[in-house]
Amino acid sequence: MYNASEKRYENMLYNRCGKSGLKLPAVSLGLWHNFGDTAPFETMRQICFTAFDNGITHFDLANNYGPEPGSAEKNFGRILKEDLGQYRDELIISTKAGYDMWPGPYGNWGSRKYLLASLDQSLQRMGLEYVDIFYHHRMDPETPLEETMGALAQAVSSGKALYAGLSNYDGETLKKASAILDELRCPFIINQNRYSIFDRTIENNGLKDTAAELGKGIIAFSPLAQGLLTNRYLNGIPEDSRIMTDGRFLTKDALTEERLQQIRNLNGIAAGRGQTLAEMALSWVLRDGIVTSVLVGASRPEQVLDDIRAIQNLEFSKEELAKIDSVSL
């Protein structure tokens, strides 16, 4: 039987999620990779234990995380049932719906039909009565925003979610969605978007500024650019790397000679700060207080500990930020 460390809250930093009452750990655990049916179950357990023992209270999922879709929720549900469930009131569990999940016109995008059915399925897979945060996973070009936001509000009012979130939205759509959710008196508190030194889309599409203006939190996924912003690729592509073993999200084409040189230059800046490249990359995302938390993935427990070290040095000089920009933009 798992017993959590009594010192689990001693070293983690917790940030308020926008203007809400909810605080999230500066580092959260994402189950996008490594929690599907192809991963060893015992490794998943140890990753979750290491995370929680070190103050990571937030576990982020989606209906389609796997492989196969749904398997990450199912595996996490088993960990909850066997081990972590006794700590449910100390956990922030999120899930999402928005990508293709089942055949036909009702298993994708942003209709009320799809979102509420998907949430019920997610709760069943995880063995939960509610999730803490329920996200719409991506903007839907066809469904009226009022319908999608209405579904999020219904999820909360029904008691199946405590808060609503939006993922992969831009600033303009965020502003419209937020106004609708305000009218519905729905506690919308957080945006989840890709953000890293190599991907600054949210700085350019208005999402980051709008979230700050509206008092909404941001949680950043892929802050290590799928592992590129680590020491993994400093000397080329290892045989056991994600590029070689799982080409779904990161391909050889992503590691050009120019990109490799950028990684090496950034590694030099990190060394000057007394950090690893991964630590600096995570610190950079958290640098100005607008991003509430960074989502990290892990294929083994030690990686979780490595990532948590980023919070020990979140300060950057103007010179360091300028150097990072000069070698990465």
Give the label of every model feature segment.
Residues 18-36, 94-107, 130, 135:
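N-terminal small/glycine-rich loop or linker at the start of catalytic domains
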Residues 25-29, 59-61, 91-95, 134-136, ...:
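Hydrophobic faces of well-ordered beta-strands that scaffold small-molecule active sites
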Residues 38-51, 110-126, 174-178:
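Short, acidic/polar
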Residues 35-40, 64-72, 140-144, 171-172, ...:
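Acidic-and-aromatic substrate-binding clefts and catalytic sites of carbohydrate-active enzymes
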Residues 2-6, 143-329:
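Beta/alpha (TIM)-barrel catalytic core signal, keyed to glycine-rich beta->alpha loops juxtaposed to Asp/Glu
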Residues 123-143:
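Active-site groove signature of glycoside hydrolases
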Residues 39-43, 71, 75, 106-114, ...:
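Alpha-helix N-cap and loop-to-helix initiation/capping positions
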Residues 1-91:
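N-terminal binding-site loop/beta-alpha segment at the start of enzyme catalytic domains
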